[in-house]
C-alpha cells in the first residue's frame, strides 16, 4: 500500500497507511523479559497509538506518528526499541532525541523501567553532566537518550560511536525543529549509518517536520491522529475574562479558595512573570515552586522532585515544562497567560489528563486576548467555555 493511500480508522480517529492493529501486548511476540517489564510498569492494554505503531517499528519500518503527550507514545517507541536491540552487543544501537533535558530523563526512566529484566544499559546524554561521564556511559550503553546539542557534541568529539546505531527516534520533533536544533539534527542524521531506521513523533506536523520526513525517511508508515482530536479528551477547557492584566492575580487567588485539587501547574509566558507571581503567592502563604530554563540544573531537578512527591502544591512554569513531563497528580492547569505559540497550548493542558485521567484547564484572558482564544478554538476544532460560577463541582 502506498504512503498516500490512507485507511481511516473511525473508532479512534486515527488515519494510517498500515492496517495491522494489535490489541494485546501478549500478541506482539515481545521478548519474554520485556513483556514482564511492560506489565510490571503498569501497562495492561496497549493505547490506540501503541496498538498501531509498536509493530511497524519492530518490523524495521520508518514510522511517522502524530500523537500528543499522554497517549502512550513514550511507551510505544521504548517498547519497540527494547525489542529491536541486541543485549549481547555492548554498544549504542538506538538513539532517542528529546527537546529538553527533563524530557530526556523522563524517557530514560521509562526505558529503564520497561527493560528492567533485560541486560541493557540506557545512558542519558544531556547537559549538566561532564563529558567524562558521557564518554564512560556511551561506551557500552545499548540505548542513548539525549538532547540534540549534547549528542552532536559527543559524536563530533568521537566519544559517541554511532557505527552500531540502527534506530534514530525523535520525540517532540516539532518542538526540537522549531527551537534552533534543526541544523544539529540534520548533521546527526548525516553521521548515522545510511540504513538507520527513523521514527519520528510529533504532536503537530509543521513544515520543518515534513521536510525531515521527505529528506531522511524511506516510505514511512504514517499514523496520524486527526487534528480535531488533538485537544486531549477528558480535559474540560474554560476561560475567565479578567479584562485587564492587573486583575489576574485576584482572580487566581479567588479561584484557589474555591477549589480543592491535589496540585496545579500555572503557565506564564516569561521568566519575569513566573518570578513575580511566585513572590506574590509566597507572600500570601501559598506553597509554591517555580521553574524556568535559566535556573541551574540542580535546582530544576530538586524543584521537579519536590513537586512530584507532593510537598509542593503549585508549580509555576514557563513553556519549559509544557512538553511531556509526567506529573501524575495534576488535575488543574491554569494558563495565566495564553501561550504565544498555538502548538504549545495542547502540551500545557495535557498536563492534567494524561492517559485518560480527567483534568481541567482554565485560561485567563484580557480583552485583547479574545481573538487569540477564538483562534485557538478554531485551530484545535474545540470549544473553550466561560468558567461557570459553581467551579467546585468541576473537581468532584
UniProtKB/Swiss-Prot annotation:
<dbReference type="InterPro" id="IPR001650">
    <property type="entry name" value="Helicase_C-like"/>
</dbReference>
<dbReference type="InterPro" id="IPR014001">
    <property type="entry name" value="Helicase_ATP-bd"/>
</dbReference>
<dbReference type="InterPro" id="IPR014014">
    <property type="entry name" value="RNA_helicase_DEAD_Q_motif"/>
</dbReference>
<comment type="function">
    <text>ATP-dependent RNA helicase which is a subunit of the eIF4F complex involved in cap recognition and is required for mRNA binding to ribosome. In the current model of translation initiation, eIF4A unwinds RNA secondary structures in the 5'-UTR of mRNAs which is necessary to allow efficient binding of the small ribosomal subunit, and subsequent scanning for the initiator codon.</text>
</comment>
<dbReference type="GO" id="GO:0016887">
    <property type="term" value="F:ATP hydrolysis activity"/>
</dbReference>
<dbReference type="GO" id="GO:0005524">
    <property type="term" value="F:ATP binding"/>
</dbReference>
<dbReference type="Pfam" id="PF00271">
    <property type="entry name" value="Helicase_C"/>
</dbReference>
<feature type="short sequence motif" description="DEAD box">
    <location>
        <begin position="171"/>
        <end position="174"/>
    </location>
</feature>
<dbReference type="InterPro" id="IPR000629">
    <property type="entry name" value="RNA-helicase_DEAD-box_CS"/>
</dbReference>
<protein>
    <recommendedName>
        <fullName>ATP-dependent RNA helicase eIF4A</fullName>
        <ecNumber>3.6.4.13</ecNumber>
    </recommendedName>
</protein>
<keyword id="KW-0547">Nucleotide-binding</keyword>
<keyword id="KW-0347">Helicase</keyword>
<dbReference type="GO" id="GO:0003723">
    <property type="term" value="F:RNA binding"/>
</dbReference>
<dbReference type="GO" id="GO:0003743">
    <property type="term" value="F:translation initiation factor activity"/>
</dbReference>
<feature type="domain" description="Helicase ATP-binding">
    <location>
        <begin position="54"/>
        <end position="223"/>
    </location>
</feature>
<keyword id="KW-0963">Cytoplasm</keyword>
<dbReference type="InterPro" id="IPR027417">
    <property type="entry name" value="P-loop_NTPase"/>
</dbReference>
<dbReference type="GO" id="GO:0062040">
    <property type="term" value="C:fungal biofilm matrix"/>
</dbReference>
<dbReference type="InterPro" id="IPR011545">
    <property type="entry name" value="DEAD/DEAH_box_helicase_dom"/>
</dbReference>
<dbReference type="GO" id="GO:0003724">
    <property type="term" value="F:RNA helicase activity"/>
</dbReference>
<keyword id="KW-0648">Protein biosynthesis</keyword>
<keyword id="KW-0067">ATP-binding</keyword>
<dbReference type="Pfam" id="PF00270">
    <property type="entry name" value="DEAD"/>
</dbReference>
<comment type="similarity">
    <text>Belongs to the DEAD box helicase family. eIF4A subfamily.</text>
</comment>
<dbReference type="InterPro" id="IPR044728">
    <property type="entry name" value="EIF4A_DEADc"/>
</dbReference>
<feature type="domain" description="Helicase C-terminal">
    <location>
        <begin position="234"/>
        <end position="395"/>
    </location>
</feature>
<keyword id="KW-0694">RNA-binding</keyword>
<feature type="short sequence motif" description="Q motif">
    <location>
        <begin position="23"/>
        <end position="51"/>
    </location>
</feature>
<feature type="binding site">
    <location>
        <begin position="67"/>
        <end position="74"/>
    </location>
    <ligand>
        <name>ATP</name>
    </ligand>
</feature>
<keyword id="KW-0396">Initiation factor</keyword>
<dbReference type="GO" id="GO:0005829">
    <property type="term" value="C:cytosol"/>
</dbReference>
<comment type="subunit">
    <text>Component of the eIF4F complex, which composition varies with external and internal environmental conditions. It is composed of at least eIF4A, eIF4E and eIF4G.</text>
</comment>
<keyword id="KW-0378">Hydrolase</keyword>
